[in-house]
Amino acid sequence: MSQTAMSETYDFLFKFLVIGNAGTGKSCLLHQFIEKKFKDDSNHTIGVEFGSKIINVGGKYVKLQIWDTAGQERFRSVTRSYYRGAAGALLVYDITSRETYNALTNWLTDARMLASQNIVIILCGNKKDLDTDREVTFLEASRFAQENELMFLETSALTGENVEEAFVQCARKILNKIESGELDPERMGSGIQYGDAALRQLRSPRRAQAPSAQECGC
């Protein structure tokens, strides 16, 4: 198998969203996650941007297809169409902007109404590197996350702190739901698909079959 083919082999594919107000650093989070560097010339997303990456979660290779949505109200009708069938989402606010935090409820309502029924969401308080300019405390956001059954991390797209961890935690919870039977990759609109590696395993005959009479030499 070629190196390219190997790099594209994965067990599952998850559709992810990155949502939240404009200026919270959503595109920078995506760029830091995929490229491992800060995108310092980032402009506001117009409509939707896309990125993908394969990660290892507990020995399973998961390909994340990530849709970075525009935060401006005028693009809301466009970006809502991309919510359908999302398995996971990063809900992002800026810890230095109370306004972006206050908008979280609206974004959360959209995600739970328009995406898949069992969408897994992690709340990300971005721009952790600007702690001296903080307007939203860790405790306040932590309570919001707990009340709304969200995971929660503070992140920094600039330094990379907790960026990969946010995506991995979200993916791990989705995997746990698959293993428990709560999520079915074969159900339409789940935001989850089996990858090539998992399909090969599902389709391969069981190795532990009883030997035939001819083989056993009876």
Swiss-Prot record:
Q: What is this enzyme's class at the first EC digit?
A: hydrolase
Q: Membrane topology type, per the record?
A: Peripheral membrane protein
Q: Which UniProt keywords apply?
A: Cytoplasm, Endosome, GTP-binding, Hydrolase, Lipoprotein, Magnesium, Membrane, Metal-binding, Methylation, Nucleotide-binding, Phosphoprotein, Prenylation, Protein transport, Transport
**Residues recorded with modification Phosphoserine:** 190, 204
List the Pfam families hit by this protein, alphabetically. Ras
- Summarize where Mg(2+) binds, as residue positions: 27, 45, 68
UniProt modified residues of type Cysteine methyl ester? 218
List the ranges annotated as motif Switch 2: 70-79
Q: Where is this motif: Switch 1?
A: 44-49
Q: How is its activity regulated?
A: Regulated by guanine nucleotide exchange factors (GEFs) which promote the exchange of bound GDP for free GTP. Regulated by GTPase activating proteins (GAPs) which increase the GTP hydrolysis activity. Inhibited by GDP dissociation inhibitors (GDIs).
Gene3D superfamilies cross-referenced by the UniProt entry:
P-loop containing nucleotide triphosphate hydrolases (3.40.50.300)
Q: Where in the cell is it found?
A: Membrane; Cytoplasm; Early endosome membrane; Recycling endosome membrane
**GO-annotated cellular components:** early endosome membrane; insulin-responsive compartment; recycling endosome; recycling endosome membrane
What molecular function terms (GO) are annotated for this protein?
Answer: G protein activity; GDP binding; GTP binding; GTPase activity
- Role summary: The small GTPases Rab are key regulators of intracellular membrane trafficking, from the formation of transport vesicles to their fusion with membranes. Rabs cycle between an inactive GDP-bound form and an active GTP-bound form that is able to recruit to membranes different sets of downstream effectors directly responsible for vesicle formation, movement, tethering and fusion. RAB4A is involved in protein transport. Also plays a role in vesicular traffic. Mediates VEGFR2 endosomal trafficking to enhance VEGFR2 signaling.
- Comment field on protein domains: Switch 1, switch 2 and the interswitch regions are characteristic of Rab GTPases and mediate the interactions with Rab downstream effectors. The switch regions undergo conformational changes upon nucleotide binding which drives interaction with specific sets of effector proteins, with most effectors only binding to GTP-bound Rab.
UniProt similarity note: Belongs to the small GTPase superfamily. Rab family.
Name this polypeptide is given: Ras-related protein Rab-4A
Name of encoding gene? RAB4A
